[in-house]
Amino acid sequence: MVSIYAFIYFIHNISQSIQISNILQNIFETAKSRLTKLIDTEEKQKSDFPETEDWKEYHSEKSGYLQNISFTNLVDICESEDIKLHILPVKGIFVLSGIPLFRCNKDLDEDKVKKILSNFNFSREELVADNYTLAFKQITEIIVKAMSPGINDPGTAINGIDYLTELLALRMKKKDQSMILRDEVAYIKLNTIDFEDLLYNIMAPIRTYCKNDIILVQKLLLMFYYLEKQESDNTNYCKYLRKEAESLMKDAKASIENEEDIEKATELAARFNLHTTKD
């Protein structure tokens, strides 16, 4: 009887692992497709955009996740009215009614504002296809849940780190801002989440739940080492990687008691040229 229960438990765990693996794979593929498309679009952008701090702000009249923006229509409006727009919320995030939605380099009457606002579509549901940063959030949540005390599944956490590594390497090819052009003229500027903020939002919860596990600490250090060697659009990206790697080592050394484990982590950190001590 005991062997039957053990077999059922084994089958349940295997099925659950396969299900989580499929979820991770689907999240990864959707985000990879979205990121690749954004990067390909950016490679064609060679125009500058003026500073917008002094432009007039116009506010959202709806609440919801900013999912779809009709850029073709907005560029048509920009051309016909001889204006430029700076869209303030990051596409895919939740927007509250009344917050600044866009800036314009000219004052707009009520009809023109409503015409522009009609090209912003909101939803009550988040989608990775519209917001690639949601994929980082979801994979991070899977890693954190896998390493929570009640579950303790380092295998799933390691798989999640592998997917994060590949997506971060792809994100490093992307600029921290995007523009919409027509005939090599930039009409619309889009805000995107900075790589530094994205990396911190990923690593802060992961450090909390993984700092006690030497295997996962090593895995994360190898992730940083790999990412530092990747092609990057911004030289500061490597500085942000180093900063997060240093924070990881600091937390790990404060949490791991085994001196041999600390020695192994320190050796890996040395490969990453981190200035760490064994105490």
Q: Which residue stretches match the model-derived regions?
A:
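Well-ordered secondary-structure scaffolds
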Residues: M1-D279
